[in-house]
Structure formats: C-alpha cells, structure tokens
C-alpha cells in the first residue's frame, strides 16, 4: 500500500475517537500521549518513554499512569454538570463521588482527590462498598468534601464504622440495600449517640442494556422494592427518624451505552423521589449511581463497548429530567450525585510491553501432484491454478469453498489411513497458497466477499507472543469479552504488512486477545507493521485504568506488573515518579501459601547432594535470584 499515510494509521486504529484526544499517532508513526490535557500540544512518545524506563532498570511489562489525565476527567465531569445546572436553572448543586472499587490504588485515589484541592467548594466525595474500602475512605476523604457514601451489604461492624466516620467529621450516608440493615443502623446509632444519614437504594423496574445490566431492574441483586421502601418510611416514622432519610440512590449498571436508558432510569427514580417527599421525607441528595460509559471502540454507538452520547449530553439529560419533574410535582430540587468511576479512570493508564516472538503462516513453494496422485489432490491443484489466474470476483468464493471442502476430505482420508503424511502436508500447503492468493484478490467493497475476508484474516493471522498475562492485566477481555484498544507503539508510518493476534505468555489457550478496534468496528485480528527480531516494536494496551488491576488474577502465578507514574512538569518536562516494582516470584508464591524460605533450604539440600562443590555457589545464587526475580520474561533474545 504505497500511498499509506499517518491519517490512514489514525483511521485504522480509530485512535482519534476512542482516546478523546489523549493519545495519538505522530507524523513519524509513533504513538503519543498528552499527559496533561490542559496542554494538548505537549506530547510524549510512548515508545521512547518505555525504552528509557527499561534503561533505568524498569522491566517490561509496565503499567504507566498519567495522573493529570485523572485531574482533567474529574474537572470535566464537574464542569459538565455545573454548565447543565446553569443552563436549566437547576436550584441545587452537583457532587461527583468516586467509587474506589474501580481502582483502589493509593496513587489513583489521591490524584483524584488532588484534582479538587484548589477548589473553594470541593465537588468530590468517595464511595465504599465494603469494610476494607470504608477504612481506606475514612482516612482519605478529609482531602475532599468529606462526603462518604456507603453501599453494599453491611454487617454490624461495617455500620458502626460508618457511624464512627460521622463522629470523625465526615458526612457519611449509609445506603440501605436490604430491610434488615435499618434495624441495625438505628440500634448502633443510638448506642454511639450519632444521628445517622440514611440513604435508600431503590430497585427500578426499568433495566438499562449492557454487559452489567443485571445491576439494575427488578431482579437486581441490590436495592429495595416499592413495598420495602414504604416499610422503611413507616419504620422511620415510628422511630421519629424520618428526617434522617437524606439520600435516594439507584444504579442502572456500569457502561450504559444508550442515553435513552439513562434518561428513562432518571425519570423513574425521579418519581420515587417525588413520592418520598410527599410522604414527608426530606431527601436532600439524588444519587444516579454509575453508568457513564467509556467509548472503548470509538464508534459512538450503542454497542456494549461504546456510548451514543457525550459527557455534556449525559449531564444535560440528568439535570433536565430532574428539573422538569421537580417543577411538575412542586418539590425542591435535590443535590445531584453521580458515581462515575469508570469514566474517571479508564483513560489514565496504559500497559506497555514487548513482543517476545512471532509466528507467521507463510506459504512454501509447491509443485503439482504426481500424475497418479489421488484425484482429490488434483482438484486442489486446480483450485490453485484458477485462483492464481484471473478468476472473476464471484468465482473466488466458489474456489475458496471448494478448496476448504477438499482439505476437509484430505484430513478425513488421512485419519483412516488412505492418505499419507506427505500428501496431507502438500494439501495443507496448497490450501495455504490458495488462501493467501484469495486474501490479496478479494475486496470488502463486494458485500459477498466480506464473510470470506473475515475468515481469511483469522486463518492467516500472524501470532504475536506478547510479554503479559491477559488474566492479570486485561481480565475483562477474557471474562466478559470487553474490548480494549491495542496498538504497536511505533512503525505506524508504514503500511501494515500483515494481520496478527496477540497471545499472552500463560499456558492457557484462553490467553488470547480476541477482539481489536479497527476503523469504525471490531475485528478479530489487528493490522500490524512488519516485526522482526532485528527491528522489533512494543505493544500498548489502552484504557486499562478501570477495574483491571483489582480484578486481575494470578493464573500461572504471573503477578502484578511494574508500574510508574508519569507527570508533565511546569516546564513541559517528563517526570517518571512513583515507580513500584511488580511482584517477585517469592511474592506470588507467598500469595498461595508457598514458603520461598523453606524452598531455599530444600534447594541447598539438593545442591549439596547432586552438584559438584565448585558449582554449588553459582547454582544456589541462580536459584535465589530466581525467587527474587520478576514473574514476567526478562531475557528472551
């Protein structure tokens, strides 16, 4: 493709859309990041940055965080809601709450909080869904507005800790997920001498569409039905505690792709709010939960990997629906709260790693079959003759199907002993030559070619063996078929020479990236420039800042990767800071209750028994270094 341009590369990987301007491709074909979105012209080349890290002793794979992107995302959400409030003359304010379950890393939480430090009135709170998260939030929330929302199932200890948080000066909302929690809250509040701030999570009839739609709807794991809501109201009235009910919460599910679903959910929850107010409650906060999506594939569509709306439209819909409803039912307008963790964190982190090798299916030169060869082999040779000639476009489809059918029959005859190994190998090579020729001859402009083109792209894709664990670093790609953008970090100024699939280094056939962003869609292979041992390039996995670290598992005992924080200083210089070493072999052994110290003693016994005395020290040193080493590959040249 001699007329390949950088614009072609940008379109091929759709980077301008899924990255929202945070990542891009430079004119020399290098992937860049704008680490401080307030200075978009200040870009960093990820390829050179990764190489510099390696030179400084940080082994790949490495997860790189850009905290200034977190700041920008927080402020963008707050600004969108503030503008919507002004536009619709909404008579209250907005609070952004970060649910730390999305990414509990201290660096991430602290940077999110730091984005609001300079604000006269911070618009940021924190959410916890478990006792460990609550303990973290109680210590960290003082750096924000001190608003804490407690979700999830709760026992007595969780509830007491939340109430103690109120005594520590925080505004702690205990959201009731089930009826039994109310009694415990009231008992413990009385014992501690605290007036609780209560919230209700209502279970809406409406259910948004998406991978996480089970979070909402009538069969949701969480929340109270309409009848249970009335029971709570009556119980609070009997205890003369109705004033404590300050927050209404609902959750449609994470990654809601369709703005109509959001609008409909807010409308139904708004009716709950108005009815509660009519019953005498004094609800002050309307918490819409999560749902603000990330456009992972950049298609701006209703697919589960995308969203058909922007941030401004999201805020406008929520504010306008609530404004109209409160006016219609003559109720005061509550403070709006959203818990938009995925949107805040996804873009800020990228995994950078190396390719340890490739396997390409290249056809070999073939000779025609012997005259006395089975007719089946002559049929396959005829397919090759036809496809290498000037077959018309429709004939190409027939040739493909005939050749695949013949190859299937070859395999069957081989299995029953009627064809030998050499004949099978010859047939497979002919089929490969036919497929390669067809791949170059077919065109996606012909609708009837497209299914076969997709098959050929998969069949002929190169295998890239990449130094990472899918299960540790991209667990959602394996578990729920989530799409994450993948790109080579350099060489994009040259036309792709092949298509490839990315395979991790675990001993599991599931360790394969099955879906790739390409153009305005999702493909099963990725276009890539030429890769050789002499001119290798690195691979980047993008938008991995939400959920992936905490959900990652240790399949094959591949542990946490190295990580680093990269910041742009006031002079536009790149600062690599807060480098955290990933797990060592000893670390991951300890996670599964294997004792590296006792292993070392065993090694010493074995070395003394089996190794010559002059070799023992070196062997023991290598074994000890093995326990201290990185779990990923470090020397594979």
Curated annotation (Swiss-Prot):
EC number: 4.1.1.19
Pathway: Amine and polyamine biosynthesis; agmatine biosynthesis; agmatine from L-arginine: step 1/1
Enzymatic reactions: L-arginine + H(+) = agmatine + CO2
UniProt keyword 4Fe-4S present: no
Residues annotated to bind substrate: 286-296
Residue numbers of N6-(pyridoxal phosphate)lysine PTMs: 101
Cofactor(s) in the UniProt record: Mg(2+); pyridoxal 5'-phosphate
Record bears the keyword Lyase: yes
GO biological process: arginine catabolic process; putrescine biosynthetic process from arginine; spermidine biosynthetic process
A Gene Ontology molecular function term of the record: arginine decarboxylase activity
Keywords: Decarboxylase, Lyase, Magnesium, Metal-binding, Polyamine biosynthesis, Pyridoxal phosphate, Spermidine biosynthesis
Family matches, as NCBIfam families: PRK05354.1, speA
Family statement: Belongs to the Orn/Lys/Arg decarboxylase class-II family. SpeA subfamily.
UniProt function note: Catalyzes the biosynthesis of agmatine from arginine.
HAMAP family noted in UniProt: SpeA
Name of the protein this chain belongs to: Biosynthetic arginine decarboxylase
Source species of the chain: Shewanella pealeana (strain ATCC 700345 / ANG-SQ1)
Record lineage: Bacteria, Pseudomonadati, Pseudomonadota, Gammaproteobacteria, Alteromonadales
Gene encoding the protein: speA
């Amino acid at each position: 493709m001699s007329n390949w341009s950088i614009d072609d590369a940008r379109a091929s990987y759709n980077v301008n859309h899924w990255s929202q301007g945070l990542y891009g491709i430079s004119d020399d074909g290098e992937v860049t990041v704008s680490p401080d979105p307030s200075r978009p012209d200040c870009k960093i080349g990820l390829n050179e940055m990764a190489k510099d890290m390696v030179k400084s002793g940080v082994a790949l794979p490495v997860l790189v965080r850009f905290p200034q992107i977190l700041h920008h995302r927080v402020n963008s959400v707050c600004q969108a809601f503030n503008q919507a409030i002004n536009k619709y003359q909404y008579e209250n304010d907005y609070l952004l709450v970060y649910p730390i379950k999305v990414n509990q890393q201290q660096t991430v939480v602290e940077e999110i909080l730091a984005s609001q430090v300079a604000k006269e009135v911070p618009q940021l709170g924190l959410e916890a869904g478990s006792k460990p998260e609550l303990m973290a939030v109680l210590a960290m929330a003082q750096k924000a507005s001190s608003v804490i929302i407690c979700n999830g199932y709760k026992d007595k200890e969780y509830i007491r800790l939340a109430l103690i948080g109120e005594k520590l000066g925080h505004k702690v909302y205990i959201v009731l997920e089930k009826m039994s929690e109310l009694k415990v809250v009231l008992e413990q509040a009385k014992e501690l001498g605290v007036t609780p701030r209560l919230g209700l999570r209502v279970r809406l009839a409406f259910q948004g569409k998406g991978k996480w739609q089970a979070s909402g709807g009538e069969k949701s794991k969480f929340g109270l039905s309409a009848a249970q809501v009335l029971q709570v109201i009556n119980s609070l009235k009997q205890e003369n505690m109705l004033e404590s009910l300050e927050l209404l919460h609902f959750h449609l599910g994470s990654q809601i792709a369709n703005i109509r679903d959001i609008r409909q959910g807010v409308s139904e929850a708004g009716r709950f709010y108005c009815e509660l107010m009519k019953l005498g409650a004094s609800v002050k906060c309307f918490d819409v939960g999560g749902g603000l999506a990330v456009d992972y594939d950049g298609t701006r569509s209703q697919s589960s990997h995308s969203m058909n709306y922007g941030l401004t439209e999201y805020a406008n819909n929520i504010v306008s629906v609530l404004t109209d409803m409160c006016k219609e039912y003559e109720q005061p307008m509550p403070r709006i709260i959203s818990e938009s963790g995925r949107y805040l964190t996804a873009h800020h982190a990228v995994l950078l790693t190396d390719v340890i090798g490739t396997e390409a299916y290249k056809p070999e030169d073939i000779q025609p079959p012997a005259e006395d060869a089975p007719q089946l082999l002559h049929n396959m040779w005829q397919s090759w003759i036809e496809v290498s000639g000037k077959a018309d476009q429709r004939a190409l489809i027939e040739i493909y199907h005939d050749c695949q059918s013949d190859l299937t029959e070859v395999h069957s005859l081989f299995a029953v002993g009627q064809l030998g190994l050499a004949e099978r190998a010859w047939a497979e090579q002919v089929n490969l030559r036919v497929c390669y020729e067809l791949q170059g001859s077919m065109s996606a402009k012909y609708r009837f070619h497209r299914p076969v083109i997709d098959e050929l792209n998969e069949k002929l894709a190169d295998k890239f063996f990449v130094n990472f664990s899918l299960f540790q670093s991209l667990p959602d790609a394996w578990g729920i078929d989530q799409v994450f953008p993948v790109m080579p970090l350099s060489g994009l100024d040259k036309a792709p020479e092949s298509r490839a699939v990315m395979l991790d280094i675990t001993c599991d056939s599931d360790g394969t990236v099955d879906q790739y962003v390409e153009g305005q869609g999702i493909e099963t292979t990725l276009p890539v420039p030429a890769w050789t041992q002499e001119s290798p390039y690195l691979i980047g996995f993008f938008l991995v800042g939400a959920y992936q670290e905490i959900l990652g598992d240790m399949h094959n005992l591949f542990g946490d990767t190295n990580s680093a924080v990269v910041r742009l200083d006031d002079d536009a210089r790149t600062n690599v800071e807060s480098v955290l070493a990933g797990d060592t072999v000893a670390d991951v052994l300890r996670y599964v209750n294997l004792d590296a110290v006792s292993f070392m003693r065993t090694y010493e016994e074995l070395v003394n028994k089996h190794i010559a005395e002059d070799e023992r020290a070196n062997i023991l040193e290598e074994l000890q270094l093995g326990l201290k080493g990185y779990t990923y590959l470090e020397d594979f040249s």
